Amino acid sequence: MKLKVGLLGGGSWGTTVASLTAKNAETILWARNQETVNEINEHHTNEKYLPNAKLTSSLRASSSIKETVEEADVIVMGVPAQSFRKVLEEAKPHIRPWVPIVNLAKGLEISTKMRMTEIVNEIMPGHPAGVLTGPNLAKEIHFGNAAAAVIAMVDKLIATRLQSVFSSGLFRVYTNTDVIGCELGGALKNIIAIATGMGDGANAGDNTRAAIITRGLSELTRLGIAMGGKQRTFAGLAGMGDLVATCSSSKSRNHHVGFQLGRGKSLEQIINEMNEVAEGVKTAKVVVELAKDYNVDMPISQEIYKVLYEGNTVNDAFKGLLRYEVGSEKEPG
């Protein structure tokens, strides 16, 4: 029996995933904007978020959350982290019992420091909660470039069942049971992407980028393990894979923010010019607090936080990192 998918969120990644699942399952995508809904239904496009892209013709869009989720066998949450709770609470009365809920957002809730699957467990206990993550730049995947992702659920049987829903052509989806590690890998790497973007914007060079990526992976792995993730997860697609893609690509929103900061623009100006959320900007606040909570030293994240929220410059950030004493490679700094 083919599963029915209800996907909440009409941004670039939500639309891309909906177009993928529509090849394997009946899919309805919810978008807030009625014009977007009409465009998807009538022209099979979403020009605002996926310019020049043709969506799967069977994909249907709706501005009604109820219509999107009431018959769904799988709920996919494609909204930003800070909107996640509100949208899920709106959907809750209409979701059937025990339906799996899959998160696409790569962020943490500021007010609670919670991961998205923790929010699912709080609002909808009993529903299997998981995450689809990895080195997944939406536009590349939509246009058919080869890519790989991870579907993580605590129950491997559910992950395996969902694998076939998301896999399509050159988009290969692997399973994992480390939901904590997979979710944290996606959220934490965004801050490191801002750091590499800053270096690129300031013309710091390839060696600097490589150093930030490598030390950044070490940094996010330390916090991830302290919070319950498994070390091997951070060496895989959800950790290193996602980190390398996001830190190396001009298509990455978080890298873009860092790049523009490195060029001298203000954060306010950069955000006002973007039409989608760069999760790392808000996640940085949470990560600095989590680092204190878990007593984990995260020098790169600390310096990025100071640039974003304390008025430090890009040069201040790099000088700050150079003040850390150099020890063993396995140590912070």
Write out the residue ranges for each language-model feature:
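NAD(P)-dependent Rossmann-like dehydrogenase/reductase catalytic/cofactor-binding core
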Residues: 196-197, 225-235, 239, 243-333
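Electropositive phosphate-/nucleotide-binding environments in soluble metabolic enzymes
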Residues: 11, 15, 34, 62, ...
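Rossmann-like NAD(P)(H) cofactor-binding subdomain of soluble oxidoreductases
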Residues: 55, 61-146, 162-164
